[in-house]
């Protein structure tokens, strides 16, 4: 249900703003998006996993807050991020 260390490192490298960047909103949103995609696949086969679904909803809310923060601080970075992640909006 979680992403592997290699997948997480790949996402961090792709979305990092500088070397060693792990905490920027772009990286955090990208990691959350990867975890959300993994959990979405999990729920296709495990429909009754309501405890896991709660965790998914918390991740979606966290991602939404980070996206709102990014949009408030820098609209261009926000537009670039949602385009690179393929998020609708």
UniProtKB/Swiss-Prot annotation:
Pfam families: Ribosomal_S15. PROSITE patterns: RIBOSOMAL_S15. GO terms for cellular component: cytosolic small ribosomal subunit. InterPro entries: Ribosomal_uS15 (IPR000589), Ribosomal_uS15_bac-type (IPR005290), uS15_NS1_RNA-bd_sf (IPR009068). Keywords: Ribonucleoprotein, Ribosomal protein, RNA-binding, rRNA-binding. CDD domains: Ribosomal_S15p_S13e. GO terms for biological process: translation. GO terms for molecular function: rRNA binding; structural constituent of ribosome. Belongs to the universal ribosomal protein uS15 family. HAMAP family: Ribosomal_uS15_B. One of the primary rRNA binding proteins, it binds directly to 16S rRNA where it helps nucleate assembly of the platform of the 30S subunit by binding and bridging several RNA helices of the 16S rRNA. Forms an intersubunit bridge (bridge B4) with the 23S rRNA of the 50S subunit in the ribosome. Part of the 30S ribosomal subunit. Forms a bridge to the 50S subunit in the 70S ribosome, contacting the 23S rRNA. NCBIfam families: S15_bact. This is Small ribosomal subunit protein uS15.
């Amino acid at each position: 249900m979680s992403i592997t260390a290699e997948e997480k490192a790949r996402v961090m490298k792709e979305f990092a703003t500088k070397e060693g960047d792990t905490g920027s909103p772009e990286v955090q949103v990208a990691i959350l998006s990867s975890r959300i995609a993994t959990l979405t696949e999990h729920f296709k086969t495990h429909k009754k996993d309501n405890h896991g679904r709660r965790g998914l909803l918390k991740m979606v809310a966290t991602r939404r807050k980070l996206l709102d923060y990014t949009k408030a601080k820098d609209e261009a970075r926000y537009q670039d991020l949602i385009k690179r992640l393929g998020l609708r909006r």
